[in-house]
Amino acid sequence: MASSVVVMPKPEFDPRMLQLLTEIYKREPAIRNEQDVYRYFAGFGQVDADLEDLLELMQELEKIRSQFEFGSNLQAARKKLPVALQEVLAVSENRASRQETNYANGYLSEFFYIYLPKAYSCEAKARVAIHVTEPYVKNASRVARALASCQATLHSFKVAGPAQAGRTDQIIAYLCSAEDLAVVEKGLTDSNTADCVGGVVPPAMKEVRPGLGFAEEPPNVPTSYVTVGGVTSKNLHKYDQKTHPLVKTDAGFAPKNNQRMSFGEFHAHRIWAGMVQWRDKYRGTSNQTIRFNWFLYEVYLAYGRKKVDLKTPYAFPARESTLADWRKEYFMNWKA
């Protein structure tokens, strides 16, 4: 569909975000909902990994958890790290049930959460994304230990399983205050982990230095999971517009409720809102470049037209522009 699109630099868009939106646009015919957008935004970065890698990572994280006496669990299964570790050990020793084997294979691509003491007394207000260099398991373990040493300040952190080693944010540290970024930097420096961090950071995050990205947490929006009667399950109503209606504000499209969503879900929320508007309004030229630029314009509006979003201004660090500006510069004065 978009093979003939000419992608021009735009001051409204960070180059990494423009690249992401270009890839999403190319896949637009297959995108059915916000969750599809999220999958592209998240950039899962799946790579080949085996249970030996997983077992080594889990054992190192368990050592850290035990040493510092932190809480921990697995993101999707919501199991405590020690329980999950026993399942993987059982699989490696060929004495596991089929269910345990399935769980263990699933852990390869999951996030492991480490809850620091402040996780129970403050709300995460910002995040630091860390891109870990190879060898992943060894270096991720070193970075995790460095973050654990910052327990007096940080909220929590999570470490991706070895099958997620291709992501740009394999480790994410959550901060109680944006000012605590300096604590993370110092912790990494004091722990001599310079060789463990490098490469690119996720779109929509400010690059502090190679391999280290920063952003404030998004505003309150629907959560992925809900807990009822002590049982945690997938929030099936998360994308139900009747349950979580969207409203148009000066800051773009926002839910009316007071819950939270992840950083990636927040941006998928905005991009999907722009795509919906583009699909609803667009009736026009066969010129693929103009079609693509109209899509970008609707995404730009969905983010709020200015620096896209007050909470995460790094996605679009540039100018505020109008439809007239876009017509002149990007639409070749074509009018819908």
Residue ranges and their predicted role:
Residues 1-336:
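Structured alpha/beta or helical-core interaction and ligand-binding surfaces enriched in interleaved
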